[in-house]
């Protein structure tokens, strides 16, 4: 945590803090400073995680472009893995929409089939000669 500060430096800072702030305000100051340090570490870790995620997305995008250039044939295993990950992500995004659209999609083909059968029956009747 204190990479560049040795034990003697920490002791000196503690003694100076005790002299300047006094024994009553020193614990409060230490708590507030440790809270600030904790908040800064959280922000730094958050930024680091976001950057790693963006780099991963950029790598997947680059792999996808390479795969497109190769025509999706004879792909390297890491490129195929990236494509599989992207397909899974796309399926997970599209899945909620497919569940909502599924009942209307099932009803529509049945209606079209009935209409097609009626039309083909009428066409068959009109094709017969009246004679």
From Swiss-Prot:
Keyword Amino-acid biosynthesis on this protein? no
Q: Which UniProt keywords apply?
A: Cell inner membrane, Cell membrane, Membrane, Protein transport, Translocation, Transmembrane, Transmembrane helix, Transport
Which GO terms fall under biological process for this protein? protein transport by the Tat complex
Q: Which compartment or compartments is the protein found in? A: Cell inner membrane
Which Gene3D superfamilies does the protein's record reference? 1.20.5.3310
Q: Name one GO molecular function term.
A: protein transmembrane transporter activity
Name of one Pfam family that matches: TatA_B_E
Q: Does the keyword Cytoplasm apply?
A: no
Membrane topology summary? Single-pass membrane protein
Question: Region Disordered: which residues?
Answer: 69-131
One GO cellular component this record assigns the protein to is: TAT protein transport complex
Compositional bias (Low complexity) at which positions? 105-123
Instruction: Give the stretches traversing the membrane.
Output: 2-22
Q: What does this protein do?
A: Part of the twin-arginine translocation (Tat) system that transports large folded proteins containing a characteristic twin-arginine motif in their signal peptide across membranes. Together with TatC, TatB is part of a receptor directly interacting with Tat signal peptides. TatB may form an oligomeric binding site that transiently accommodates folded Tat precursor proteins before their translocation.
Q: Which PANTHER family match?
A: SEC-INDEPENDENT PROTEIN TRANSLOCASE PROTEIN TATA, CHLOROPLASTIC
Regarding protein family, the annotation reads: Belongs to the TatB family.
NCBIfam families xref list: tatB
Q: What is said about its interaction partners and assembly?
A: The Tat system comprises two distinct complexes: a TatABC complex, containing multiple copies of TatA, TatB and TatC subunits, and a separate TatA complex, containing only TatA subunits. Substrates initially bind to the TatABC complex, which probably triggers association of the separate TatA complex to form the active translocon.
Descriptive protein name: Sec-independent protein translocase protein TatB
Provide the species name.
Shewanella piezotolerans (strain WP3 / JCM 13877)
Record gene name: tatB
